C-alpha cells in the first residue's frame, strides 16, 4: 500500500474519541470538533501558568468524556481468565524488552536506510586509477545498488510514502548515474518516463514536505541531466518556479559566510554553483572528512578537490552502508530520539542501564557553548538536537546548561538553524518541552517557553502542523497534548496512553534531502511493547482496584463522608504516577494513605471533635496495642485508630516480607508527626504531602534510616513540596486563579525541579527525589484539569485497553 501525502489535515483531537459509551463515535467527534485546544483551568502562556481561561466547551453529558460510575462496583468474574492472560503478557514482554535492549546496545553510529540520492552521488565518482579510456566508477557497489533498487513504477526513493519531491529528486539523480556509466538503459528509460509523467505534480506538492535543499539541488541535477542529453522537458512551467526559488535562496546565502563559518549550506554543497573557493571550504570539513555528514556533499567536494579526507569518509560510509550510502554518523539523534520515544510510550523503566550508556555517549560529545547536531563532532548545531539533549540529560541527572540555546535566538524568535526563515512545528514542540525543565533564573528557557507556546498555538489554530522535517502519524495531537497538559500537570500513564495512539511506529518517516527512516527511533517493536505493557499494567491496576474497594467497605470509610469516587480518584492518581506492576505496594500505600488522611481530617473537622478529642486520639495512637471498644460500641475514634493501625501494620508486614526491611517504627513516627500538626490545628494539609512522600518511600525501601530527615536537601525538598502543594490545594478547593500568588507557584516549581533534577552532591537517593516530584505533579494535575477530563483519563488509564 502506498500512502500519498495530501493537504488534508487530520483533526487533532481524534485520539480523544475512542471511549465506548452510549454516545456514538460520530457524535463524539462532532462534539469535540466544536472546541479548539483548551486548558480547563489554566492557560500556560509565558511564565504565568495560572491565567484564567474562559471555557467554551463545558458539557452536561459526562458519558462521552467517560462516565466513571460504572467502575465503582466490584467485578471478580474475569479474575481467573485475566490471570492466564497476564502470564502470557509477561512472557511476551520479556521477549520484546530483550529485542529492544539488543537494538539499544547495538546502535553504534545510528541506523538509517540506504539513500538513493547519496548513493547516486557517490556512484558519480570515477576511478581515476584505471588505465586507458575505459572509465569505471570508484564505488561500483553504489551503482549496483541503484540498479537493484528501482521501484516498479520506474522511480527511486521511499516506497511506501509517495512524496513528489523525494521521488523526482531520487529518480533524476539515479537516471543521471545510469546514463553517466551507460548501463541498464531500460531502467534509465523507465526512470525518464516516470519523471515526464510526474513532473507536473510539483505544482500541487505540499511546500511543507519539500525535501531539504530541493530548490538548490534539483536545478543542479537538471543542468547535469541536460549536459548528458537526457530527454526531460526542461522548459516545463513548473520548473520556472523551482529555479525562482533557487535564486531567492542563493541571494540569502552570503558567499563570504559560506566560506568562513560552518553553516547548513555545507549539507548541500552539490547544489551550489561552481564559484566555490575549495581551499577555504576544506577548512570547514568535519574531523571525519565529511561536509556535515552528507555523502552527496562530500562526494561533490571530492570530485572537485581529490581531498583524501573526503575519500576516507566516503569509503567508510560505503562500507558501513553495505555498498550504498547514507548520512553518517547519526549517533546522537538516534540515541536521543529513541530514549524520548520509549519514555513517552511508558516503557523506559525497562531500559535504565541502556539509557545510561546512551546518554553517556551523548554527554561525551555535548558542546556547552554550541550544542549538538545529529552526528558527533559536528561543527554545526541545531535547536532540535540541542534542546532534546538538554532536556534528557537534565532529567537524567547530567549537569548541562541551556545557554547553547542562545545560538538559535533570532531577535524575539527561535530558529532551528542560523539563517532559517520558516519555523518547524516539531522543532518548536521539542523546544517547548525542553523549556519546561526550567531552573530558576534561566532566562533563555523562559523566553523559549513564551515563544514556542504562542508559535504552537498558532500552528493548531491555523491548521499548520505539516512539518518540514518529519511525516508522523499525529503531530497535531502531540502538540495539543503538550499545550493542554504542561509537564508539571502531565502524569506518566496519561501521557503514555495518548502517545501510544499518536506514535506511528515504522510508518513515521523523516525528511532530509530525501525521505529516510530511522529504525532505532520509529519501529513497530516499540509500539507493540508499549501496548502490551500498558495492558499488562492496567490489568494489575484493575485487580488492585478490586482490593481497594473491598478495603473501603471493610473499613467503613463512608461513615466519614468519603465517597467511592474519591477512592477511585485517589487510586487513579497513584496508578497514573507509579504504574509498574512490580510497584504495587508503593502504589497502594499512596492511594490508601490519601484515604486514611481524609478519614482523620474528616473526623478532626467534625464540630464535635475538640482539642481534647484530638489529643486523646494521638495519645491512643502512641500506645502499641489496638484501641478497645467503649461499652461494647465501636466509636468513630476507635474506628479511626483501628483503620490507621491496621493500614500501617499491613504495610509494614508486606514491606518486611518483600524487602526484609522493618519500617514499622519509621511509619509510626511519620504518622505521629502529622497527627501532632493536626491536633494543633496547624496547616496539616501541607504536611500531608510530606507524609504521603515518606509513606511511599518507606514502602519502596528507599529510606533506610531516619537521619535523612535532617539532611538539608531533604528538608528543602520537604518544605518546598509542602508549600507548593498547599497552594495548589488552595487553588483546587477555592478556585483561586491569577495573581502574584499563582506566579509564585511557577517559581517554586522551578526551584523544586532544580532540587530534584539538579546535579548536586546530595546524599538523597534519586528515587526519593522522584517520589517528591511525582506527588507534586498529582496536585498540579488535580488543580489543572476539570472533573470531566479527569473522568475521561480515569476511564482511559484504568479501564480501557489499547
Swiss-Prot record:
Extent of motif DXDD motif: 382-385
Transit peptide residues according to the UniProt entry: 1-24
GO CC entries: chloroplast
Pfam family of the protein (one): Terpene_synth
Free-text note on domains in this protein's UniProt record: The Asp-Xaa-Asp-Asp (DXDD) motif is important for the catalytic activity, presumably through binding to Mg(2+).
Protein known as: Copal-8-ol diphosphate hydratase, chloroplastic
Compartments where located: Plastid, Chloroplast
Positions that bind Mg(2+): 382, 384
Enzymatic reactions: (2E,6E,10E)-geranylgeranyl diphosphate + H2O = 8-hydroxycopalyl diphosphate
InterPro entries tied to this protein: Isoprenoid_synthase_dom_sf (IPR008949), Terpene_synth_N (IPR001906), Terpene_synth_N_sf (IPR036965), Terpene_synthase-like (IPR050148), Terpenoid_cyclase/PrenylTrfase (IPR008930)
Tissue expression per record: Expressed specifically in the secretory cells of the glandular trichomes.
GO MF, any single term: magnesium ion binding
Residues annotated to bind substrate: 249, 468
GO BP: copal-8-ol diphosphate(3-) biosynthetic process; geranylgeranyl diphosphate catabolic process; gibberellin biosynthetic process
Pathway assigned in UniProt: Secondary metabolite biosynthesis; terpenoid biosynthesis
Keyword Plastid: yes
Amino acid at each position: 500500500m502506498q500512502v500519498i501525502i495530501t493537504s488534508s489535515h487530520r483533526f487533532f483531537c481524534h485520539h480523544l474519541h475512542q471511549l465506548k459509551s452510549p454516545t456514538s463515535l460520530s457524535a463524539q467527534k462532532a462534539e469535540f470538533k466544536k472546541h479548539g485546544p483548551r486548558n480547563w483551568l489554566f492557560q500556560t502562556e509565558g511564565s504565568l501558568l495560572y491565567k484564567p481561561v474562559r471555557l467554551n466547551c463545558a458539557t452536561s453529558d459526562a458519558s462521552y468524556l467517560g462516565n466513571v460510575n460504572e467502575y465503582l462496583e466490584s467485578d471478580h468474574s474475569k479474575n481467573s481468565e485475566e490471570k492466564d492472560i497476564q502470564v502470557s503478557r509477561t512472557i511476551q514482554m520479556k521477549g520484546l524488552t530483550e529485542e529492544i535492549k539488543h537494538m539499544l546496545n547495538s546502535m553504534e553510529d545510528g541506523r538509517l536506510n540506504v539513500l538513493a540520492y547519496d548513493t547516486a552521488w557517490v556512484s558519480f565518482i570515477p576511478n581515476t586509477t584505471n588505465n586507458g579510456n575505459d572509465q569505471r566508477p570508484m564505488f561500483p557497489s553504489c551503482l549496483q545498488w541503484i540498479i537493484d533498487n528501482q521501484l516498479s513504477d520506474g522511480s527511486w526513493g521511499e516506497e511506501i510514502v509517495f512524496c513528489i519531491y523525494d521521488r523526482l529528486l531520487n529518480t533524476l539523480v539515479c537516471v543521471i548515474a545510469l546514463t553517466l556509466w551507460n548501463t541498464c538503459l531500460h531502467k534509465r528509460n523507465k526512470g525518464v518516463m516516470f519523471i515526464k509523467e510526474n513532473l507536473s505534480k510539483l505544482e500541487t506538492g505540499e511546500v511543507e514536505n519539500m525535501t531539504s535543499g530541493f530548490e538548490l539541488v534539483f536545478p543542479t541535477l537538471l543542468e547535469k541531466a541536460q549536459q548528458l542529453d537526457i530527454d526531460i522537458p526542461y522548459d516545463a512551467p513548473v520548473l520556472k518556479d523551482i529555479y525562482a526559488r533557487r535564486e531567492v535562496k542563493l541571494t540569502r546565502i552570503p558567499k563570504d559566510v559560506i566560506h568562513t563559518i560552518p553553516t547548513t549550506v555545507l549539507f548541500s554543497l552539490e547544489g551550489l554553483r561552481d564559484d566555490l573557493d575549495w581551499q577555504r571550504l576544506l577548512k570547514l570539513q568535519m574531523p571525519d572528512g565529511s561536509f556535515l555528514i552528507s555523502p552527496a556533499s562530500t562526494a561533490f567536494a571530492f570530485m572537485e578537490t581529490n581531498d583524501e579526507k573526503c575519500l576516507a569518509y566516503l569509503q567508510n560510509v560505503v562500507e558501513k552502508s553495505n555498498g550504498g550510502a547514507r548520512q553518517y554518523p547519526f549517533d546522537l539523534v538516534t540515541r536521543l530520539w529513541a530514549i524520548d520515544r520509549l519514555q513517552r510510550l511508558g516503557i523506559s523503566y525497562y531500559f535504565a542501564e541502556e539509557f545510561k550508556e546512551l546518554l553517556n555517549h551523548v554527554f561525551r560529545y555535548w558542546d556547552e557553548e554550541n550544542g549538538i547536531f545529529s552526528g558527533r563532532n559536528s561543527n554545526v548545531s541545531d535547536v532540535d538536537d540541542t534542546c532534546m539533549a538538554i532536556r534528557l540529560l537534565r532529567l537524567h541527572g547530567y549537569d548541562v546548561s541551556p545557554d547553547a540555546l542562545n545560538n538559535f535566538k533570532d531577535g524575539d524568535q527561535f530558529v532551528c538553524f542560523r539563517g532559517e526563515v520558516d519555523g518547524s512545528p516539531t522543532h518548536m514542540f521539542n523546544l517547548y518541552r525542553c523549556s519546561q525543565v526550567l531552573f530558576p533564573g534561566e532566562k533563555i528557557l523562559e523566553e523559549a517557553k513564551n515563544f514556542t507556546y504562542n508559535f504552537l498555538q498558532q500552528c493548531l489554530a491555523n491548521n499548520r502542523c505539516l512539518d518540514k522535517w518529519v511525516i508522523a502519524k499525529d503531530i497535531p495531537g502531540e502538540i495539543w497534548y503538550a499545550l493542554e497538559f504542561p509537564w508539571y500537570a502531565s502524569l506518566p500513564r496519561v501521557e503514555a496512553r495518548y502517545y501510544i495512539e499518536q506514535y506511528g511506529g515504522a510508518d513515521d518517516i523523516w525528511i532530509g534531502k530525501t525521505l529516510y527512516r530511522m529504525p532505532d527511533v520509529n519501529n513497530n517493536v516499540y509500539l507493540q511493547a508499549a501496548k502490551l505493557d500498558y495492558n499488562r499494567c492496567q490489568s494489575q491496576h484493575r485487580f488492585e482496584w478490586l482490593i481497594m474497594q473491598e478495603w473501603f467497605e471493610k473499613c467503613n470509610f463512608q461513615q466519614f463522608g468519603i465517597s467511592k469516587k474519591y477512592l477511585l480518584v485517589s487510586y487513579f492518581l497513584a496508578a497514573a504516577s507509579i504504574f509498574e506492576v512490580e510497584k504495587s505496594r508503593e502504589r497502594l500505600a499512596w492511594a490508601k494513605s490519601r484515604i486514611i488522611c481524609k478519614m482523620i481530617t474528616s473526623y478532626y473537622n467534625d464540630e464535635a471533635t475538640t482539642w481534647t478529642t484530638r489529643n486523646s486520639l494521638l495519645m491512643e495512637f502512641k500506645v502499641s496495642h489496638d484501641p478497645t471498644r467503649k461499652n461494647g460500641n465501636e466509636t468513630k475514634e476507635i474506628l479511626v485508630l483501628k483503620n490507621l493501625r491496621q493500614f500501617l501494620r499491613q504495610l509494614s508486614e508486606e514491606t518486611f516480607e518483600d524487602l526484609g526491611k522493618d519500617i514499622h517504627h519509621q511509619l509510626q513516627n511519620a504518622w505521629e508527626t502529622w497527627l501532632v500538626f493536626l491536633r494543633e490545628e496547624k496547616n496539616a494539609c501541607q504536611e500531608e504531602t510530606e507524609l504521603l512522600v515518606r509513606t511511599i518511600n518507606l514502602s519502596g525501601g528507599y529510606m533506610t534510616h531516619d537521619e535523612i530527615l535532617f539532611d538539608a536537601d531533604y528538608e528543602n525538598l520537604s518544605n518546598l513540596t509542602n508549600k507548593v502543594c498547599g497552594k495548589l490545594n488552595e487553588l483546587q478547593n477555592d478556585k483561586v486563579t491569577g495573581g502574584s500568588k499563582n506566579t509564585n507557584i511557577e517559581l517554586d516549581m522551578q526551584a523544586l525541579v532544580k532540587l530534584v533534577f539538579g546535579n548536586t552532591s546530595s546524599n538523597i537517593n534519586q528515587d526519593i527525589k522522584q517520589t517528591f516530584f511525582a506527588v507534586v505533579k498529582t496536585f498540579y494535575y488535580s488543580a489543572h484539569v476539570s472533573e470531566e477530563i479527569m473522568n475521561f483519563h480515569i476511564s482511559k488509564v484504568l479501564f480501557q485497553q489499547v
